[in-house]
Amino acid sequence: MGGDFAPEAAVKGAVMAVDAIGDECRIVLFGDEDRIRAVLKAENCAADRFDIVHTTEVIEMGDHPAKAFQQKTNSSIVVGFGYLAKGLINGFASAGSTGAMMVGSMQAVKPIEGVIRPTISTVAPTVTGGKVLLLDVGLNVDCKPEVLAQYGIIGSIYAQAMLGIRNPRVAVLNIGEEETKGNAQSKAAYELMKESEEFN
């Protein structure tokens, strides 16, 4: 279990989740079993409410993601993605290395056919009480215009399916609203998105 304040923050979050969800699903925790059990005990939560898979390695934030994913095969991220690839779990989340999570999503699980690159998204509130979905928030340093345009399609589908927004409006977040502003990638992505009939 990587990430800031690991494993305490992740285990406490898992306890909150299992309290909210109940027996509807089973949460599997990957990491140092002794440390996980110590946090569960401190939280007055019975360890038998979870499945715990002991791992001995951690992909550190400074590790090269692809190399670490290949070399640290007993890390929580690699083992977790292995469980996901084998169908032993239905979903996998980690607060650890973002780069290793991207490598895992591309190598262990495989993206949906046609998806060029995965993206990280977040939902933020609007001043009117609605929600806005932001994509590409911390994974990619540079994106080709085609990838940014595809993120528009992915975001539109996600907003409809997960946020219940019937006809989401898609835009490129840029340094100004004028079409002539921004870097070359943003302007080219805008042109591709403007011509697309895949989204609003």
Regions found by a protein language model. Give the residues of each.
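Short glycine/serine/threonine-rich phosphate/pyrophosphate-binding segments
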Residues: 4-11, 74-87, 91-105, 116-120, ...
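Glycine-rich phosphate/diphosphate-binding loop of Rossmann-like nucleotide-binding domains
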Residues: 8, 21-28, 34-37, 141-200
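Short glycine-rich anion-binding loops that position phosphate/pyrophosphate groups of nucleotides
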Residues: 1-2, 57-58, 97-99, 177-178
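N-terminal glycine-rich anion-binding loop in soluble enzyme alpha/beta folds
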Residues: 4-61
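Short beta-strand segments
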Residues: 29-31, 53, 94-96, 123-124, ...
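Short, well-ordered, mixed-charge alpha-helical segments that flank or form enzyme active sites
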Residues: 61, 100-104, 110, 129, ...
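Short, acidic/small-residue loops that bind anionic groups at enzyme active sites
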Residues: 103-138, 195-200
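Phosphate/nucleotide-donor binding subsite
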Residues: 45-89
